[in-house]
Amino acid sequence: MNTFLIDYRDIQTPKKGFSGLFNDYSHEGQMHDKLTEKFFHFDYLKEADYYKHLNTLVSRSFRRKELAELLIRQNRRFGTAAKHLESIEKALSPRCMFVITGQQPGLFTGPLYSIYKALTAVIVAERQKAMFPEYDFIPLFWIEGEDHDFEESATTSIIDAGQIQQVSLDPWKRLPGQMVSRSAMGPGITDTLSDFTSMLQESDYREQIVSMLQEIYTPDSSLELAFGKTMAHLFKDYPLIFLSASDPDFKNLAKEIYYRELATCPHTSHTIIEQSSLLENMGYQTQVKPRAVNLFYVNHHDQRMKIEQSSADSFSIVPDRHRYSRHQILEMCDDHPERFSPNVILRPVVQDHVLPTFAYIAGPGEISYMAQYRKTYEHFGLKMPFIIPRGSFTLIEPAVRRTMDKVLQKTGRLTQSRKQLYHTAFHDLRILQKKAISGAENHDFDTLLDRTEKNILAELEALSPTLGKLDPNLEQVLAGSLVQIEKVMTGIRQKTHRAGRRKHDELVAQLDKAAAGIFPEDLPQERVINIFYYLNKYGWGILDAFATMLRAHSSESHIILEL
């Protein structure tokens, strides 16, 4: 497998590329230093900060026994390998910390980036253990099952016959705003799974994949449970564990954050607005808009409902509009923390209150909005963990690689490397397409044919005086031959042009197909395609290949991996 690295700052082809804030944060330099100083508590590029954060976590108290019991119970349900269950007991020690990543549940695991996040957490935990052998670091995947965007969770994409095909699960007996973790998939999952697996081509791995998915994706299961079981199976050889934050026992561990948010709101929103203003003054765009109350209320149908603060001491739950005093809503929180759910602002605060989080592995979008949270953490008496960019890949299949080789031939740049070609493709795919098509049209054939015809006619005409002396009739024969030669050359030109157009059309089609594989729907591949397309074609070992690449390379570059 060949590997090439592309600087994130050079990737401009997808319509949703990487933000300026992410580019500055993920590259060592002056802008990175400014960002970490103003918007984060620790710099993942500075070794000294690792010692500071270790001391911070060791000095804090956590409800480790309750946390470990919860994790063991949940991971047994997800089917996590027994050897990884044993590692959870290390969490009882104050010298054990977590490297966390997370995502909402995805259908058949969803886009590739969930896999890359999980592997990055594993690799970062390995590195920290090597740096600090007296400590333990457990990689943990936070399953955001409280998310209520069912459509996003219940949709995935796969490549079938060179085309991107979307597969979706229709909601079954589901109410608006209902948490994904509480929604049974229903009988429709049988047809959805059949549609998905029918697009997996015959291979040595297909039968095993289909059998596994059929066992996990059943009508009575939820997307969250199926996602956790699938991920646990894929990562059975890696020490990754899982956490569902919708668990009532977890809510009890998080109650202090919910209570403080309700007791002090709208202070959290003020901290976000203050940080956002600083970011905007530096020229960055902000993503998260705070609410007066950054919690949802979960009703008895498991629907997340907005909590609105109508006055300093008055709250209402939308849409029923029943009013509560601050004292009443605080009592509700104290008695039933399972009825509250954090929004995107409070979620990481809850995470880092309950768990001793050494690092969080974040995607580009997450890093952009985490930059808005420093003062929010301080409001809750916490420090942010290290925020480390996840690994990022584009997978190049053999057919795409062959197309790239043809492009090198057509552009006449055989000395140019494929890395340079990929660089052009990721910077501006249209430029690469224009160069390749221009080379395929190959106007030099006309020049060559004109020169050849001119030379043949000139040589034959030079024979005319000699042949005329020998026999005058031969001059007429020669004249007729010259006319025939012109007709023959015209025919050759026409056939050459037709062949050139065919080559042109073939290359255009191949380039379009290659572009669809690299940038499906004009988006980064990792945000669209499902991992099982690649597992089915290339085998389970592809996960090990990803891990090897992540161990070898920093997170400052996007990895192009030729399969």
Swiss-Prot record:
EC number of this enzyme: 6.-.-.-
GO molecular function: ligase activity
Keyword Transmembrane helix: no
InterPro entries recorded: Bacillithiol_biosynth_BshC (IPR011199), CC_BshC (IPR055399), Rossmann-like_BshC (IPR055398)
Keyword Ligase attributed: yes
Keywords: Ligase
HAMAP family registered for this protein in UniProt: BshC
Name of the protein described by the UniProt record: Putative cysteine ligase BshC
Organism: Chlorobium phaeobacteroides (strain BS1)
